[in-house]
Structure formats: C-alpha cells, structure tokens
C-alpha cells in the first residue's frame, strides 16, 4: 500500500467519511463499513482529498486532457483534483462539470468550465450502480470527446446483481479503466495493522467472502 493510500484512509476515518458499524445499503445488504465523501466538509480536508486523487491518477499513468466532475459530488472533487495536479504535480489542466438542469440564459447549456475536448478524466466519489457514469459517457460522446478513465475514492470490490461489480461492468461496457485511491483490500490491510481491530477485520472479511468480486 502506498503512503497516499494509507494517508487517505486516515483522512477518511478522521472526518467520518469512512465509518465502521452496521449500515444498510440501497441494495439491502448490511455492510460493516460505509464511505461518504460528503463528510469532507472543510477547506483543508478538500485540499488533502484533491492531493490523494491527483496522486492516484498520476500513479496510474493515464493520459488525459480535461478533468470532469459529474454533478453534484463530482464537482468539488474534480476542482480539488485539478488544483492538486497543478500545485503538486505540475500539470495545469482544464476542468469542467455539468448541471443537472440546462440553463436557458447567460452562457446557457448544461456544461460549465472548459470545453470537453480530447481525453476526459471523470472524477467521482464511488460507483454504485454505474448510472451516473453512463450519463457522463453520453455527455462526453455528445461533445465529440473520448473518456480516458474514471477516478473514484473507493472501490468496494463488491458484486452487483450478477457476478461482476458495477466498476467491472463500467470497464467492460465502456472500455475505460476505473482507478480508485483505495479498495476494500487496502482498508482490511490498514485495519490489520491497528490494535484492537481483529473483530472488525473478521466482519469485513466475512462480508467480502459473501459479496466480494473475483479479482
């Protein structure tokens, strides 16, 4: 596990973006952990979060021209990632986001920021059903651009309704990589090295054995 990944886990726990307990998901499953990027609610937390996103995409070595944030959670994540790429990695790239509703006055349209041109990096918090990604792919295609990759905070490595995860389905359907700062295995590895967490690790491993995808 890279330092930026363990630092991200610590940041997420500190801000209660990563919580442990019993959480009923939309799927009806009871999960021993839950991730919510909306808990990064301060300027310093968002700045650090952007640095971790930027580190993950840099480590992946993906070539892209524009950073795109899907409304709504993806908007601050894309902005923070673009800032970190410029400040920390010397890559001053344009960014863009969409509105949920088209604007019929002023600049109009559904897109705000830089034009969608070339290879597009999509930045979001998680992929659950993949619905948001499908919508974004349509926006990118309509603009005449190409998706380069999807960058998210956490890969739960969890089956959807079938044997594949939503992330694996996105990769298969659209032919683009989905890159995450961390995945479930990173969380388990981190907790295994923390005192007094053996019972929690066992619960997470049991959940993974039931719902985890084959990697």
Swiss-Prot record:
5-phospho-alpha-D-ribose 1-diphosphate binds at residues 26, 72-73, 99-100, 103, 105, 124-132. Its EC number is 2.4.2.10. GO terms for biological process: 'de novo' pyrimidine nucleobase biosynthetic process; 'de novo' UMP biosynthetic process; pyrimidine ribonucleoside biosynthetic process. It is an enzyme of class 2 (transferase). Pathway: Pyrimidine metabolism; UMP biosynthesis via de novo pathway; UMP from orotate: step 1/2. The keyword Magnesium applies. It comes from the Bacteria. Keywords: Glycosyltransferase, Magnesium, Pyrimidine biosynthesis, Transferase. GO terms for molecular function: magnesium ion binding; orotate phosphoribosyltransferase activity. Orotate binds at residues 34-35, 128, 156. Its cofactor is Mg(2+). The keyword Plastid does not apply. It catalyses: orotidine 5'-phosphate + diphosphate = orotate + 5-phospho-alpha-D-ribose 1-diphosphate. GO terms for cellular component: cytoplasm. Catalyzes the transfer of a ribosyl phosphate group from 5-phosphoribose 1-diphosphate to orotate, leading to the formation of orotidine monophosphate (OMP). HAMAP family: PyrE. Belongs to the purine/pyrimidine phosphoribosyltransferase family. PyrE subfamily. Homodimer. This is Orotate phosphoribosyltransferase. It comes from Cellvibrio japonicus (strain Ueda107) (Pseudomonas fluorescens subsp. cellulosa).
């Amino acid at each position: 596990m890279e330092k930026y990944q363990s630092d991200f886990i610590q940041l997420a726990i500190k801000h209660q973006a990563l919580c442990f307990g019993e959480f009923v998901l939309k799927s009806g499953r009871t999960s021993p952990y839950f991730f919510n990027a909306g808990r990064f609610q301060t300027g310093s937390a968002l700045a650090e979060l952007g640095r971790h996103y930027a580190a993950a995409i840099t480590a992946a070595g993906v070539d892209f021209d524009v950073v795109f944030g899907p409304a709504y959670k993806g908007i601050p994540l894309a902005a923070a990632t673009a800032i970190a790429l410029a400040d920390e990695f010397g890559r001053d790239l344009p960014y863009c986001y969409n509105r949920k509703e088209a604007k019929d006055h002023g600049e109009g349209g559904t897109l705000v920021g830089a034009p969608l041109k070339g290879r597009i990096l999509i930045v979001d918090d998680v992929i659950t059903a993949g619905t948001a990604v499908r919508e974004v792919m349509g926006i990118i295609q309509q603009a005449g651009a190409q998706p380069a990759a999807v960058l998210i905070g956490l890969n739960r490595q969890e089956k959807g309704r079938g044997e594949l995860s939503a992330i694996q389905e996105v990769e298969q359907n659209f032919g683009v990589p989905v890159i995450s700062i961390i995945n479930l295995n990173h969380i388990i590895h981190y907790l295994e090295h923390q005192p007094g967490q053996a019972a929690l690790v066992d619960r997470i491993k049991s959940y993974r054995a039931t719902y985890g995808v084959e990697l």
